[in-house]
Amino acid sequence: MKRYSVGCAALAVLLMGVTGSAQNKARAENVPEIPFESVANFFKMPPDVYFGESMGVARNSKGNIFVYHRRDDTRLFEFDPNGTFVREWLPNSYGHEFAHKVRVDREDNVWVVDEGTNMIIKMSPEGRVLMVLGRRPEAVEGAVETPQGDPPPDERYLFGRPTDVGWDPQGNIFISDGYINHRVVKFDRNGRFIRKVGSNLRGSEPYQFNTPHSLAVDAQGNVYVADRGNQRIQVFDNNLVLRAIYDNVGNPWEVCISPGPHQYLFSSNSNPDSNTPAASWDVTGEIYKMELDGRIVGKFGRAGKQLGQFQTVHGIDCRNPDELIVSEISAWRVQKIRLRPTTTTSSR
């Protein structure tokens, strides 16, 4: 774990870079296991309706659960606090193509991030569209081709497969713009651009990203970015000045910060094995529970398809830090998880 002070020290670190790949790829050892259970058969689906790749999950203040998933098409489902299906939001929406994330803000507005349409859509608690950031690639004839190459060319004036959205206490919007542009962008609450961090190209230095895959904002307005390809979490203040790097979390696919006076950071460590025929099968599967300063409280879970195991966690709702909703890509499911924390010493 590395820390940076604001101002000249941060600039010096940026210029010098971080030496030593072992430092960047450090993994937490001797982390205590947190006892937990998965609630069996929690979600009650309508006949012939199933989850696909479960990309995002979020709860509102009433405890209703939103699941954003994709099979042949992208769909957003709402469930009541007991897991009973309520309704589908925006079926066959122009903004739905390849789901990536759903979040609920402090006013119970529902936001979806679709990496296929490059759109972030804000909806009222009743389901009315209030704001759209980004634009779906359009063509007069046929389909717009996805940018090719490794890495693909950046799309700095547009979103390039965005991945997540979050807000600070003032309502400013932060978007991780993810697979192509490798940056985080800050907008005001009305959607006006303020600033961005990231070089628009993959990089491993501080202030650079290799697929910023998820983000979360704490009560002080600090932004925690899951820099998945670099196996770290970069922490920025509200002006997107680097404050710390946590490199003890493995391969972070998802981050979530719980509300309340004592906030916790949850981070999923998913490591698909590219050498297997099913390259998306997770071989780690654990979720870390952390203090906001990067100390690890404990971890739970392991890779697998059984109840209480995880296959590539892509979404975590931690509105209640002892009762999580966890969505998985490879297992095509969503689990309700109850933690039974024990008193432990945090690990750095």
Language model segments and positions:
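Bacterial N-terminal signal peptides that target proteins for export
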Residues: 1-9
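Hydrophobic membrane-targeting alpha-helices
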Residues: 16-19, 289
